[in-house]
Structures are given as C-alpha cells and as structure tokens.
A protein has these predicted regions:
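C-terminal alpha-helical cap of glycosyltransferases
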Residues: 406-440
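N-terminal strand-loop element at the rim of the active site
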Residues: 28, 34-44, 50-57, 70, ...
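A short, well-ordered alpha-helix in the C-terminal region of glycosyltransferases
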Residues: 375, 382, 389-403, 415
Length: 440
C-alpha cells in the first residue's frame, strides 16, 4: 500500500476509535435513565417497536410493518420510527398501530435542532450502516421517544437500535432484539459491541438456524433467550404466475452485496442462446451506473433491463417465469418467500444464511455455489429450456411458502410477547436491580 492510500485509512480508523470512546462515555452518562420507574402492565401489553425509517423501502421495514398488523389484535402497538426520511410511506402502515417519528426531517427545526443536526450521532456505532443517516439531534429525539412514556415490551429491529434498547431501556421493560442478519455478517468492531450489549436483552429473535447457533455460542451463559422466528409473508395480491412469460426477474438495492454484477455476467450466455428471454432487475442504488456500463460492455442492452423501483413487484412476479437471487450474503430475504408464493421457481446462490433454509434444491428451487457465475448460468439455462421443470418447481414453491404465512408467524410473535408478561417485578427504589432472566 502506498503512502497516499495509507493516510486516509489511518485517519478513518482514528476517527472510529475516538467515536467508540465518546459513545461509551455517553452511554455511561445516560445510565440513570435505566433506573426509572415502570408501572405494572395492564391487560393489554403496550409494545413499542423501534424502526429505522417507517417510510423507507428496505426488506426489514416491510417485514416489521407487516408483522405489526396481526399483533394489534392482542397488544397495543406503537411504532417509533427513528427517522421520517420520506414525506410519505412506501409500504402501507398497519391499521390499529400508532406511528410516531422521533426525528421528523420534514418538520420545521429550531436553532438547537439545526445545531445538533450538524454533528454525528454518539449513540449509533460508526461501523453500523445507519450511522450516516443519524445525528446528535437524532440521539436526543430517540431518547425522548424511549423515555417519554413507559412501555411493557420494547422491540428493536436493527443492530443500532437493538444496542440502544439493550443499553438504555428502563429496567422492568422487556427488551426483544430482532436481528435480521447474523453475528458473522458484522464488522469485528461492531461484532464486539453486539456481543457485549446483547447480553442485556430479554429475548433475541433471529431468522435462521445458523444465526441462532452463532449467537448461542457468543452469548453463552448470559441468560438471554434466543429464538428463531422467520419472516412472514403477507397475503399476496392477484393470481400467481403461470410461468408463460419469457422473463427472468431479480430485485433489490443496487449495491455490491446483491451481486447483480455476477448475475449480469451469468446471463450473458443465456441472452445469446435464448434471444426471446429478458432479465429484468428492479431496484435503485449507488451501483446503477456501474451496472449499466457492464450491460453495455457485454452487449446486453435491451436484453438486461435496470427497471428501477416498482410499487407492484408482485405484479411483475406474475409476469415472470423465474426469480433469481445473486446475493453474496443474506439474512432471510422476503423476496424469495414472496417469489415462491407467486409460484416462481427460484435460482439462488447458496449464500449464508437465508436461501439454504428457504429453498430445497431440486424440490422447490435451485441452489448453486455462492459466486459461481458458470453454475448460475447453468441453473438458469436448465429452467429456461425445461418448462416442465419450471412448472414442477414453481408449484412446489407455492406450497413451501405457506409455512411463512403472516397469520402463523404473527401468532408465534404474539405468544412470545404475551409470555413476557411476568417480567421482573419493578424496583421502585430508584436503584438498579439485579438481572433476572426469563426461562427459555
């Protein structure tokens, strides 16, 4: 590495280490917030759900909003969005749930808010991907949202918010961390903070068996209850695909992890062999121009389409015959469950950790080694050339997707929350109480 490259990396490491020191100091200063009184629960538990941006477009946002709908039948659900990052929600907000915004980016700001908004967050780890969207003013707003009124159960839905819940939630409130990835997917500095803080949770919910095994090893002896509850798929609109259109479909953010560069390269031989077929990639992101250049370089203009965002992905699935996922790493991708529910056979890299749990190779889809472009080409070629195989895998995929029905998964979550009712008696002395654990 030459000297000009080394200096920016050194400065970045120094900044991140300084931020970690300041973050620990801030958390230590805010510890008295955990000693506040929390009233006993009523007949219906007040459940507060922390979300990054309720108006965003990510898979985590969609799954959390979907889940909150059924939970309102048994509990009082309040969704607290750390940010209001867009004027209108992309996904429908659940009826019956209260939605509040900690930091409304579209509301008029006073002098203090404008000043603090210029400084980076102290409560969000610099290694967490949401750090760039947060500010010192967001920290203040989140603390207000957490402590203005008590709740019985607090559910946090991404690492930055789970850390906040574990470290600053008042004692007597049950905390559930809903981790949509896995411990191994985080950078080492963030991983260390996760292991240290997650020990204070009441329950940690993960999506896959490997993720559960990883956390059980890392949190051994902590007493945290670790459960595996997969994502749920809402009822799908319209009719499923009849697999008659010559379209291969992919969707996701145009970022490196989604592997669309590998998919485009894998599709190049298919375009020559089957000129009637088209690959459509839905989504937007920082790599759009780079992917467009790759399409032009490989002579795939008109054969591979970067179709941008769509609010009707299910409709696009109904007009496709194959779904393909080329990610280098995934949690439990909702889009696979939805594609299977729409009757599409799915071709996916066998990446950690979700796809191997969702797809049974040769039964309801095809799995190929992660990053193997030639194997991905061969799997797509096999499905395109064999309509009978497409139909057999697609029909079985619909049956497999029923295991992720929203009503079924919602009932599991409701039982989990209700089981936290006898959470520790509240200590009204104003002093921190000793940790008490709920049996697994």
């Amino acid at each position: 590495m030459n000297e000009p490259d080394r200096k920016p990396r050194l400065r970045r490491r120094v900044r991140r280490r300084a931020h970690r020191v300041l973050r620990r100091a801030a958390l230590w200063t805010l510890r008295p917030l955990r000693w506040r009184r929390v009233p006993p629960p009523g007949e219906r538990l007040h459940v507060r759900v922390l979300l990054q941006n309720a108006h965003g477009t990510g898979g985590t946002i969609r799954t959390v909003l979907n889940l909150c709908g059924p939970l309102t039948r048994d509990h009082d659900i309040e969704i607290v969005s750390a940010l209001k990052g867009n004027p209108k929600p992309f996904f429908p907000l659940p009826a019956g749930a209260a939605v509040t915004y900690a930091d409304d980016r579209f509301a008029p700001k006073g002098r203090t808010a404008r000043l603090l908004g210029r400084f980076p967050s102290l409560l969000i780890p610099a290694e967490e991907s949401s750090f760039r969207y947060m500010s010192l003013w967001t920290d203040v707003c989140l603390l207000r949202a957490l402590h203005r009124t008590p709740c019985d159960v607090l559910i946090a839905t991404r690492p930055s918010l789970i850390l906040l819940a574990a470290e600053l939630t008042p004692r007597g409130t049950a905390t559930i961390g809903q981790d949509h990835m896995s411990l191994e997917s985080y950078q080492p500095p963030l991983r260390r903070q996760v292991v240290r803080a997650y020990r204070r949770l009441t329950v940690l919910s993960v999506l896959t068996a490997p993720a559960r095994a990883g956390y059980e090893a890392a949190l051994a002896g902590s007493g945290v209850r670790i459960v595996r509850i997969p994502n749920a798929s809402p009822p799908l609109p319209g009719r499923p695909s009849r697999r008659e259109h010559e379209v291969v479909l992919a969707a996701g953010r145009l970022v490196a992890n989604k592997g669309f560069d590998l998919l485009i390269r894998a599709y190049a031989p298919i375009a020559a062999e089957h000129p009637g077929w088209t690959l459509r990639i839905f989504g937007s992101g920082l790599r759009r121009e780079r992917l467009a250049a790759l399409i032009a370089e490989l002579g795939l203009t008109g054969r591979v389409e970067l179709s941008g965002f769509t609010r009707d992905l299910h409709g696009e699935m109904a007009r496709a015959s194959i779904y393909v996922l080329s990610s280098r790493r995934e949690g439990m991708p909702m889009v696979i469950i939805e594609a299977m529910g729409m009757g599409l056979p799915v071709v996916s890299f066998d990446c950690p950790f979700g796809p191997p749990e969702l797809i049974t190779h040769g039964h309801d889809g095809l799995l190929v080694p992660t990053g193997d472009v030639d194997a991905l080409t061969a799997a797509l070629r096999e499905l395109i050339a064999d309509p009978g195989l497409r139909d057999r895998l697609g029909e079985q995929a619909r049956r497999s997707a029923r295991a992720y029905d929203l009503e079924h998964i919602g009932a599991r979550w409701s039982r989990l929350i209700s089981g936290l009712r006898p959470f520790p008696p509240h200590d009204f002395t104003g002093k921190p109480e000793k940790s008490r654990r709920i049996p697994a």
